[in-house]
């Protein structure tokens, strides 16, 4: 099966693009979605997170306290590595399981840090980057997450630069406009990927 790695900076529109691909019939595996499942109440990562970080980072409902953890890991590299050491193996296991079950003519794996970690480069045949201006990233990310501009910029600095991301892309979606514009670009790529999938 043809496997596409979909990536992009915070607020670029990765999830919106993935949802359109899914509606067109592509298989979609989203690593952010998996991470949320692992860290919600009853999630498989929580016992290890509780042991490593303490009750302060668990909500009264038993889920990861994302705000507290975000504040910690952006100021403490060791804490970030410790959290990644817990989450990343669990995410990779679940990605492998879902890839094995995937239906559809081709598969999109949504990996925000595809180029930073390199974890999934071995299973993707193409890299699709969703790109947008820095201003669009900041306004979307602050509106969606409730983070302030400073927090969003801190995340952007931790990610590879736009130029570096675009330099590693096989395909690019430019998401500076509206949803119909995004849909047109996704439909064009869907046609391309259907053709490539038939040849693979």
UniProtKB/Swiss-Prot annotation:
Pfam families: CoaE. ATP binds at residues 11-16. Its EC number is 2.7.1.24. The keyword ATP-binding applies. InterPro entries: Depp_CoAkinase, P-loop_NTPase. It is an enzyme of class 2 (transferase). GO terms for molecular function: ATP binding; dephospho-CoA kinase activity. One of its GO terms (biological process) is coenzyme A biosynthetic process. Transmembrane segments: none annotated. It comes from the Bacteria. Keywords: ATP-binding, Coenzyme A biosynthesis, Cytoplasm, Kinase, Nucleotide-binding, Transferase. It catalyses: 3'-dephospho-CoA + ATP = ADP + CoA + H(+). Pathway: Cofactor biosynthesis; coenzyme A biosynthesis; CoA from (R)-pantothenate: step 5/5. One of its GO terms (cellular component) is cytoplasm. The keyword Protein biosynthesis does not apply. It is found in: Cytoplasm. Gene3D superfamilies: P-loop containing nucleotide triphosphate hydrolases. Its main location: cytoplasm. Residues 3-200 form the DPCK domain. Belongs to the CoaE family. Catalyzes the phosphorylation of the 3'-hydroxyl group of dephosphocoenzyme A to form coenzyme A. This is Dephospho-CoA kinase. It comes from Nitrosospira multiformis (strain ATCC 25196 / NCIMB 11849 / C 71).
């Amino acid at each position: 099966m043809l496997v596409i790695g979909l990536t992009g900076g915070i607020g670029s529109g990765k999830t919106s693009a993935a949802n359109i691909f899914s509606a067109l019939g592509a298989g979609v595996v989203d690593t952010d979605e998996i991470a949320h499942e692992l860290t919600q109440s009853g999630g498989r990562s929580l016992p290890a997170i509780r042991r490593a970080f303490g009750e302060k980072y668990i909500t009264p409902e038993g889920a990861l306290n994302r705000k507290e953890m975000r504040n910690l890991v952006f100021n403490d590299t060791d804490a970030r590595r410790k959290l990644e050491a817990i989450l990343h193996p669990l995410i990779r296991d679940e990605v492998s399981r879902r890839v094995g079950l995937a239906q559809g003519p081709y598969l999109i794996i949504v990996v925000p840090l595809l180029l930073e970690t390199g974890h999934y480069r071995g299973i993707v045949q193409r890299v699709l980057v969703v790109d947008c201006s820095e201003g669009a990233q900041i306004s979307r990310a602050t509106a969606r997450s409730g983070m302030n501009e400073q927090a969003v910029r801190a995340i952007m600095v931790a990610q590879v630069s736009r130029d570096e991301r675009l330099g590693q892309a096989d395909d690019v979606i430019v998401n500076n406009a509206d949803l119909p514009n995004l849909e047109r670009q996704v439909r064009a790529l869907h046609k391309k990927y259907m053709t490539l999938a038939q040849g693979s």
